[in-house]
Amino acid sequence: MENDAELISEVAAGRSENTPHQAAFWKVSGSFLSKVLGFVRDILVAKIFGATYVVDVAQLVENVLLNVVSFVTSPISIPLVPELTHARLQSQRDYRSLLSSVFGLFSIVGLILFTAVAVFPRLFVVLFSGGFKGAVLAYAEYTYRWMAALSVIIVVSATIKTALAVKKDFVLLSFSDVLMNMVVISGLLFGTRQMELPILKTGAQLASALALWVYFAIREKWFILPRYGHWDPRVKSLLKQAGPLFIGSATNMLLTLIDRTMASFLPEGSIASLAYAQKIFGLPLGVWAVQISESSYPYIVSAFATSDVGKGYQLARGAIQRILFLIVPAMTGLLLLAPSIVRIIYQRGAFTEANTALVARVLQGYMGLLLFSSVQFIETRLFYARRNTMTPMFVCLAGLGMNVALNYLLGFVLHLGAYGLAIASSIAAFASMTGMYLVYRHMYGAVDYTLIFRDVLKIGGGTLVMAAVILGLQSRVHILPLIAVGFASYVIATALLHEDEAMGYLKIGRRLLARVARRNL
């Protein structure tokens, strides 16, 4: 183990690696800023193009290409992190051999899709948007041809992002989407119109991918190129590990389809209420929980690669504590303020008070899903760090079966409608989280989550203070300042309780204020 640790130190010598806290900070900051810029981008698109077929086509084509490529690259990228980490322990040559081989595999997928889209755009229009006719059909074919290059561009980004994650360098990795949105916003401000929009979107993705590729080349003193012959033998092992993840991805898509299909038999507005609610709770889930789980994963893998299991468990516990620090108050705030939040976001025009009540109730039903799936992100990565992708797949399949059964029971037998489907998802998420914990404990031993129990209690105490403040001021204060005051009370309460995460953020705040003060002197 000591020799492995020395090897990692030698490999990392002279390289700047982020700490787990820094990695989480960069990932969350980049994701949040990207969301904000994405909102600005959408406002500009709406102002210039309105709700026309131009926007419909551009969004649909981009989503189709992103999803098709990501369906292949994402399941491979997850086990690629431990494989690359182990390769680094062997030698830099092994690391580069595996990375360039995977780049070759990814690029083949991208080139095949690029050729198919560029040569047969109408086939993709028929497959994914059969309702397009006339001028809309012609514009869709034009857009597919121009955006076909995304198939190759995305695999470049996916390869470099995985490599940077293994190197624990999260700065540009986290802000590449920010750069992409800035390019799109700049193009819109400088007069991009209907025929230039697909070119602008493709160019923005290209700028982001090139920035990643050049940065990686400068950092590593190595211009990575795809390898097409004599692939690294570990690619076979990688594909075997990726197999269950392909099934898991398909399972998640299938569950979404089943939810929507079952909701179609419920009263009008049920499908829409599920979608609207998911967009709201998806913000803390995507900006916080997903980013922290992704940023912590390479560190857990590195600990396991050097047989330092205790360190890996410590990192996993820290990641869960960091996730709970925001997810618990976010869940509580959404439970208490769901009607007001839905009202301020959606209630205008044809969206009535009755719609607000339905979406708010569904949103409250999803709160268990928000909490339990956030914790499960770390649990699954403990399996992945051990190169075990099969077990999480079986737990996922069991969760799918339970979710469908609960959908029928709560949504139809007990007549809870869309709210019942949301509750079913929360119960199934709790069962999956618990099952993942029990199976891991049986296979590998305890992770000692009780070591963070005291801090979790402090998070709960701060959340109770926040809830009391919200309930006390809810009838007298507007929703936006109420959210700010409630969250401030939570941070102060957890800091007074000396909760680790709160104290860490206060230290960061004091350092930033001190730097500003020194500059002003």
PLM features: what roles do these ranges have?
Residues 112-134, 332-352:
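Short membrane-interface helical motifs at transmembrane helix boundaries
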Residues 2-20, 214-252, 310, 442-460:
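Interhelical loop/hinge segments that connect adjacent transmembrane helices in multipass membrane
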Residues 2-10, 471-521:
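Membrane-proximal transmembrane or re-entrant/amphipathic helices at the cytosolic face
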Residues 22-46, 201-208, 212-216, 231-302, ...:
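Transmembrane helical elements of multi-pass membrane transporters/channels
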Residues 171, 179-210, 390, 398-434, ...:
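Membrane-interface helix-loop junctions in multi-pass transport and translocation proteins
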Residues 74-90, 289-308, 320, 379-380:
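Helix-loop junctions and terminal segments of transmembrane helices
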Residues 46-67, 139, 237, 263-285, ...:
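Interfacial/gating helices of multi-pass transporter permease domains
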Residues 132-160, 186, 351-379:
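Alpha-helical transmembrane segments of multi-pass membrane proteins
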